[in-house]
């Protein structure tokens, strides 16, 4: 296992989520700008709801979307839709990933929006897919080789043909990255995390000085 990977095990998904909020909360200071990258899926929802309740009055927090399926925001599989539903009633600034018919244009526009609003990428929460993908950086897809810091369109043909995703370089340059991987259904991929192989999650861990894995499973 990489020395740069710190593993924190809790007894349940809820405990792991609360511990994650405690860790991230240490970086949030009064009257200081703070940015948090958000992933989609059901795993982080409990964390998001608690985070929204705790920091609902904090207008210094900017939220950006790590990746999304290339679908309209009102689509039920849109990550941005879930983020908006949870955080829209808070004072936090949501940097919304807008849908454009051309996925490359969507990625370019979101790169400009995020990079013009965020000077320091403080924290981000990532899930890990059963195939080891992070964000929408799937194994053997072209986006894995993009060297820019920003967002790109990635053709994956999973649920939707295209995804808009943070680049590997952007994820590598975030100050604090947390992998939230919980549930018995993640036991197989958890056995692979931290190995020296070509899985996107392990490539990211290998290239970062530190990555934290929060889980409720044995590893």
Where are these regions (language model features)?
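Ligand-binding beta-strand-loop-alpha-helix segment within the catalytic cores
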Residues: 1-4, 58-125
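ATP/nucleoside-binding phosphotransfer catalytic cores, i.e., glycine-rich phosphate-binding loops
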Residues: 173-219
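A glycine- and small-aliphatic-rich helix-loop capping segment at beta-alpha/alpha-beta transitions
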Residues: 50-58, 84, 139-147
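Class I SAM-dependent methyltransferase SAM-binding "motif I" and its flanking Rossmann-like core
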Residues: 124-126, 130-169
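Glycine-rich beta-strand-to-loop/alpha-helix junction loops that act as flexible
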Residues: 38-43, 51, 126-130, 182
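Short, conserved loop/helix-junction motifs that constitute active-site signature segments
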Residues: 54-62, 143, 169-175, 204-208
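Short, flexible loop segments at the rims of nucleotide/cofactor-binding pockets, characterized by
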Residues: 12-15, 101-104, 155-160
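N-terminal glycine-/serine-/threonine-rich phosphate-binding loop
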Residues: 1-36
């Amino acid at each position: 296992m990489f020395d740069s990977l710190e593993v924190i095990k809790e007894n349940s998904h809820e405990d792991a989520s609360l511990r994650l909020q405690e860790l991230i909360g240490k970086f949030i200071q009064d009257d200081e700008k703070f940015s948090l990258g958000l992933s989609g899926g059901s795993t982080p929802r409990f964390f998001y709801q608690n985070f929204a309740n705790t920091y609902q009055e904090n207008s210094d927090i900017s939220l950006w979307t790590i990746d999304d399926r290339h679908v309209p925001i009102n689509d039920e599989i849109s990550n941005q839709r879930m983020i908006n539903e949870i955080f829209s009633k808070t004072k936090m600034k949501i940097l919304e990933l807008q849908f454009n018919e051309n996925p490359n244009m969507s990625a370019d526009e979101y790169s400009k929006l995020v990079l013009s609003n965020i000077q320091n990428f403080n924290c981000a929460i990532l899930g890990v897919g059963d195939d080891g993908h992070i964000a929408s950086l799937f194994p053997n897809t072209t986006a894995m080789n993009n060297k820019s810091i920003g967002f790109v369109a990635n053709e994956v043909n999973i649920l939707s043909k295209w995804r808009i995703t943070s680049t590997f370089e952007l994820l590598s340059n975030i100050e604090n990255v947390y992998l939230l991987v919980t549930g018995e259904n993640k036991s197989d991929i958890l056995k692979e995390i931290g190995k020296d192989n070509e899985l996107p999650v392990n490539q990211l861990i290998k290239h970062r000085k530190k990555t934290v894995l929060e889980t409720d499973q044995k590893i």
